[in-house]
A protein has these predicted regions:
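Short, contiguous strand/loop micro-motifs
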Residues: 8, 42-43, 59, 73-74, ...
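Class I S-adenosyl-L-methionine
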Residues: 25, 56-60, 172-175, 209
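Receiver (REC) domain switch/active-site residues of two-component response regulators
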Residues: 31, 65, 97
Length: 401
């Protein structure tokens, strides 16, 4: 019994995700696909537009055989920590043999070479990066420009491609924890990441979200698997959409409650950024205005939004220090994959639970992370058009389709 792992957000699930799951099974020869999915918040620093249970069910109905939750400290993190959290869950689950991911280049060997460069940066390359940062570039832009100046074009290009960057970090994470997972790059088809263009039955998740927010939901039907469109229509105006603006005042309130020292302890706050946040949240009452006031070439908007979401949720310190707090929360499985769940219980190095009552299996640090996950679900629920009672997300049984 072979399984391939995928780390994803499915925000929302679309035809490109179904294609990736199909190709991942084909390329790996796996019988099952295990998806590690971000929960209530995603890497762009926003709440997931649709609640996690609905997104998990969409994945199970369209190629995934099991969906595991990626805890918020890793879902709301840089590419490095996001990848490390997902890879650690897959590796310690004991049931994944490989990890597949979308890639602009589709060349696993090239990504291996890129990972080697990051793990062994020459002093000259480091100096170029520092020089670019001193000119006001964000770290990702400074690094990409330095690589463009220092590396062969073919190798440098992968550092400017969002999915390739994640692929590189998956490979680095595998090496970092000495995992046996085999990385498999799946060439992207259709449109680029975050593109507003369409190609056949494909468009980006960001374009689908844009169409939903602008009231043009009827235009997304061609780009999502059959059945999901009706699901979306049934929840829009009730449990969706959840957006950053939906939690605007709550986020500004959370920022205003914090001292400069507390702001400094948030993940990714460096170089005096706490001073800018401290001033901006006292000048503006809207999170969009706060972000605009703080934004500069040095900080990407995604990074700033992640910091603000961490303030709202009470996430402090580096996610790298939370690896020993991980547990495996199974959101759902396919009925035909019951044997996969049995194998998970047998082989996992981490506590496994499928219902809230199983939290007694967790140690103190894992219980703290579990409490954070409950808090994230409760806060995300406040952003719904019809807010939900607390802990409602954890009161449901395991999804079986």
């Amino acid at each position: 019994m072979k399984s391939v792992g995928i780390i994803a957000e499915y925000n929302p699930f679309h035809n490109g995700h179904a294609y990736q799951l199909q190709k991942a099974k084909e390329a790996s020869g796996a019988d099952f696909a295990v998806a590690v999915m971000s929960g209530d918040f995603v890497q762009r620093g926003e709440p997931a537009m649709f609640e996690r249970r609905l997104r998990a069910r969409w994945a199970l109905e369209n190629g995934a055989d099991m969906v595991i939750a990626l805890p918020a400290p890793f879902a709301l993190a840089s590419a490095e920590a996001f990848a490390l959290g997902g890879v650690t869950l897959l590796s310690k689950s004991g049931i994944a043999d490989s990890i597949a991911f979308g890639s602009e280049c589709g060349d696993t060997d090239l990504l291996y070479r890129a990972a080697y460069v990051l793990n062994n940066e020459p002093d000259e390359l480091k100096a170029l990066i520092r020089s670019n940062i001193s000119r006001g570039l964000s770290y990702p832009d400074a690094r990409a420009r330095a690589f463009g100046e220092y590396l062969p074009p073919e190798l440098a290009s992968v550092f400017s491609s969002p999915n390739d960057i994640l692929g590189i970090e998956y490979i680095r994470a595998i090496r970092r924890i000495d995992a046996t997972l085999q990385p498999i790059a799946i060439g992207r088809t259709g449109v680029a990441h975050d593109s507003t263009h369409t190609c056949g039955g494909f468009t980006s998740a960001s374009n689908i979200r844009r169409l939903i927010v602008s009231g043009e939901s009827e235009h997304i039907k061609s780009y999502i698997p059959e059945g999901i469109y009706e699901d979306m229509l049934s929840v829009l105006g009730r449990t969706a959409p959840i957006m950053l603006q939906s939690l605007s005042r709550e986020t500004v309130y959370a920022l205003r409650r914090m001292s400069k020292e507390q702001l400094k302890s948030l993940p990714d706050v460096t170089e005096g950024l706490e001073n800018l946040l401290y001033s901006a949240c006292r000048k503006y009452a809207d999170i969009g205005s706060v972000l605009t006031a703080v934004k500069s070439r040095r900080y990407t908007m995604a990074r700033l939004k992640r910091i603000c979401m961490c303030a709202l949720l009470g996430i402090y310190g580096s996610p790298m220090k939370k690896l020993d707090s991980l547990f495996i929360r199974v959101l759902g499985i396919r009925r035909e994959a019951q044997s996969l769940l049995s194998a998970l219980h047998e082989k996992s190095e981490l506590p496994v639970f499928t219902r809230y009552g199983d939290v007694s299996k967790l140690n103190e640090r894992q219980s703290e992370l579990m409490a954070l996950e409950v808090r994230c679900a409760d806060i995300a629920a406040l952003g719904r058009p019809s807010p939900s009672p607390v802990k409602s997300d954890f009161s449901y049984p395991l999804i079986i389709v």
